[in-house]
Amino acid sequence: MAQEIKFGTDGWRGLIADDFTFDNVRRVAGAIASYVLKNERPQHGVIVGYDARFASPRAAQIVAEVLAEAGIPVKLANDYTPTPAVSYAVKHQGAAGGVMVTSSHNPWNWNGVKFKGSFGGSATPAIMKKIEDELAAAAAPKGTQAKIEEVDLKKEYVKAVCAFADMDLIAKTKFKFAVDAMYGSGRGVLTGIFAERGVHCVAIRQELNPLFPGINPEPIEPHVAMLQETVVREKCDAGLATDGDADRIGAVAEDGSFVDSHKIFCVLLRWLLERKKWPGDVVRAFNTTRMIDRIAAKYGRKLHETSIGFKYVADLMMEREILMGGEESGGIGYSRFLPERDGVLNCLLLANAMAEEGKTLGQLVADLQHEFGPHYYGRLDLHIPDEMKENAIQRARSESTQSLGKYKVLKKEYMDGVKFFLDAPTNGNGAEAWALFRASGTEHLLRLYTEASSKELVQELLVTGEQFVRGSA
């Protein structure tokens, strides 16, 4: 009996040799082929890329073969490739879609498949539903054998991101950066750009190592410890990191402190609105900082909130002009470039913001906290049985739950999980406290997110939230 294949917020992922098998890759590729044949212009072909994980090159070859056997021409990456490079090629070559073999920031023993729409971004929920519906087919479609062409997907992409940022200004200011590829498919890309432009950088974890020794390729603490140490030791002005497939960003300030994706989003948003004055609305996911709301309000920009997953942000980018959209996990995109998150581009734009403001990353973050009030954020991943996970969500939704620890629940929201807004101290103009409980649909996992006006309050809410989930509070 065939294993069930479940699509999450960004495609399909599974454990290598358990769920992620070459047979299942063929099934997913067959479903994608059927979708393209029925809904897109198959003669325009599909772009296929892959990251630096175990089995990624072979899995990408299998995807290419299934598509070609269905009569769909394929351009297959000739090397490990950032996900946004695949999306860029899809849009600018007019392809019918793109496939990226990756498990993004997951541990070393995972892999997966992402599908990119013909517009050059994360497939919308409607597209993903159509692909899922095709999984039930007994066999992949067959057609007149099409050509598989191996191509360099990085060259034109690198030109494009360099044109989008002011590389001359970055080079002129003489800031020094530490650059961490986390052994992912962004290895050599950002460091190559900096080297060509004469930007001083210190490179770490650029080599190929699919075991990701000691880390998950996710640019958050504790996985950025080596980057933090490097920034301090080498006296860098900032540390820049990309995840396993280089579509997400993480950063470190000059003192070695971690700068989360929320602060990165806010630094870039404020810079774009204050300096660049680009048009468009602002989009954030349900689990992101509400400092974004304050910045958008100051500059008179409309704010949209979406469910969690960049595909929902991309969906909105298809409907209207979006200056900037992002999610909690470090995915940030811009309509005027691509309706896609891009770790490499955001690293360049962060360096650009530092250069134009003449300030280190830590100084830019401090400016935010001063102007818009102290905002601190925390996340806790609880690997628990499904029964406990479901029970916690039911209790959170229950009308009888009117407090979290010693704090009264002022209101609840249910867009994606259950969010409590809490009667907790704001320390003047600081963040209004909230806690979000969200159960994973594909893993034995419940994530707890919280924001508050102090680090201490964030930690208190994480502890109290975990006690609530486990039934001890």
Language-model segments: residues:
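An N-terminal, well-structured beta->alpha segment
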Residues: 1-70, 96, 146-177
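Short beta-strand-to-turn element immediately C-terminal to the catalytic PLP-Schiff-base lysine
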Residues: 115-118, 250-254, 334-335
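Proline/glycine-rich low-complexity loops and linkers
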Residues: 78, 133-159, 253-326, 333-334
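Gly/Ser/Thr-rich active-site loops/lids in small-molecule metabolic enzymes
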Residues: 124, 203-205, 257-276, 343-352
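Gly/Ser/Thr-enriched, mixed-charge loops and adjacent short helices
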Residues: 1-2, 15, 111-234
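N-terminal small/polar loop signature for handling phosphorylated ligands or for N-terminal nucleophile
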Residues: 34, 38, 42-110, 162, ...
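Phosphate-binding and adjacent anionic-ligand microenvironments
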Residues: 238, 278-451, 456-473
